[in-house]
Amino acid sequence: MRRNRVDVITLGCSKNLVDSEVLMRQFLSNGYTVHHDPASVCGEIVVVNTCGFIGDAQEESVNTILEMVEAKKAGRIGSLYVMGCLSERFREDLKKEIPEVDAYYGKFDWKQLISHLGKSYYAEAENRRKLTTPRHYAYLKISEGCDRSCSYCAIPIITGRHRSRPMEDLVEEVRMLVKHGTREFQLIAQDLTFYGLDLYGANRLAELTARLSDIKGVEWLRLHYAYPAQFPLDLLPVMRERPNVCKYLDMALQHISDPMLGRMRRRITKAETYELIERIRTEVPGIHLRTTLMTGHPGETERDFEELLQFVRDIRFERLGAFTYSHESGTYCDKNYQDDIPESVKQERLGELMAVQERISAAHNEAKIGSRLHVVIDRAEDGFYVGRTEYDSPEVDPEVLIPFVSGQELNPGRFYMAEVTGAEPFDLYARIVD
């Protein structure tokens, strides 16, 4: 155990990662050294920032807490604190089941944790995060919470109502990060497309995106977690006309069959979904769409699932992720539906869905062979420089693998022109041409 050291372990999504970065800055401001590597935890203070979204994430969080309890018993770490979404939802249960943890805090209880340690909370440090990502890219959380009421989702229970961050704060944070070398920003939120309604009485996502793209030094802005219902169409000209706004949109659709969209309380129809996708692709030529789909929601029939498969074949998404339904306490589903789809059927449908997408992804990537794309280098690994195009977000999307060449050194964080020389379903191979 090392004195004056804090280890923060982050589980779950990029929004959770931003929360950890805010907390780490508070520890730094109080004179601690901070670390964010779960493989080398040995601090006198350990904070596990948990995820509580679905069953698998909850299980991972509990297992991580138990691992840290064992490390504490063995004397490898000092005090152990748990915060985040799982603790927000199930704090009292966790206290009973794992009492060895020194204290449990909710998702937004940074001040209470710092106060518990007898330290000062520095409000001015809230917009000066300690980045855990490579310096050249960062996640920018533009809002917190969600006002939607999807049947399956526990996020509004955990995070509360939607709360936009003031636009001036976001502009200032990006300017500051650019000064320290950040060039790429992933705009994230539980619901990106609700931005501004609470603060300004109108959707201001297009204006925010334009203002951020005007900041000198911003190379790429990428938009994550849009909601299809009431999509702000004024965003599309901004994406089309501004070179540093990536031709990329992450918009979770979940399903396509009208009966399922109704049961999910998505407030959009099949016809409206097709129309929106056509509008986006028409107004922003070359855009890459990423979506998330779900299998096994209560009431999903074979006909519903076949409709979903056909939708994926029709639209041919450039990027797609999927997961199985998880029956979460406190949700509309929990109160109104039975979890009536066997887990084996959920998994079988998930596998079939992803097999269809793998073939589509392979075709998309093969079509890129011979093309030239701007690539940012993230790291060197196993004989390759590993990078991404504007169509690829960190961690979740394909990567570009560029073999080492004698006499050629590529720098992480630099942008290069590359020619695609080969393709796999979820990766590209390339060579530098500039």
From Swiss-Prot:
Residues 132-363 form the Radical SAM core domain. [4Fe-4S] cluster 1 binds at residues 13, 51, 85. It is found in: Cytoplasm. Its EC number is 2.8.4.4. Residues 366-434 form the TRAM domain. CDD domains: Radical_SAM (cd01335). InterPro entries: Elp3/MiaA/NifB-like_rSAM (IPR006638), Methylthiotransferase (IPR005839), Methylthiotransferase_CS (IPR020612), Methylthiotransferase_N (IPR013848), Methylthiotransferase_N_sf (IPR038135), NA-bd_OB-fold (IPR012340), Ribosomal_uS12_MeSTrfase_RimO (IPR005840), rSAM (IPR007197). One of its GO terms (cellular component) is cytosol. GO terms for molecular function: 4 iron, 4 sulfur cluster binding; aspartic acid methylthiotransferase activity; metal ion binding; protein methylthiotransferase activity. Gene3D superfamilies: Methylthiotransferase, N-terminal domain, Nucleic acid-binding proteins, tm_1862 like domain. Its main location: cytoplasm. GO terms for biological process: tRNA modification. SMART domains: Elp3. Keywords: 4Fe-4S, Cytoplasm, Iron, Iron-sulfur, Metal-binding, S-adenosyl-L-methionine, Transferase. Its cofactor is [4Fe-4S] cluster. SUPFAM superfamilies: Radical SAM enzymes. It catalyses: L-aspartate(89)-[ribosomal protein uS12]-hydrogen + (sulfur carrier)-SH + AH2 + 2 S-adenosyl-L-methionine = 3-methylsulfanyl-L-aspartate(89)-[ribosomal protein uS12]-hydrogen + (sulfur carrier)-H + 5'-deoxyadenosine + L-methionine + A + S-adenosyl-L-homocysteine + 2 H(+). Binds 2 [4Fe-4S] clusters. One cluster is coordinated with 3 cysteines and an exchangeable S-adenosyl-L-methionine. [4Fe-4S] cluster 2 binds at residues 146, 150, 153. Catalyzes the methylthiolation of an aspartic acid residue of ribosomal protein uS12. HAMAP family: MTTase_RimO. Belongs to the methylthiotransferase family. RimO subfamily. This is Ribosomal protein uS12 methylthiotransferase RimO. It comes from Porphyromonas gingivalis (strain ATCC BAA-308 / W83).
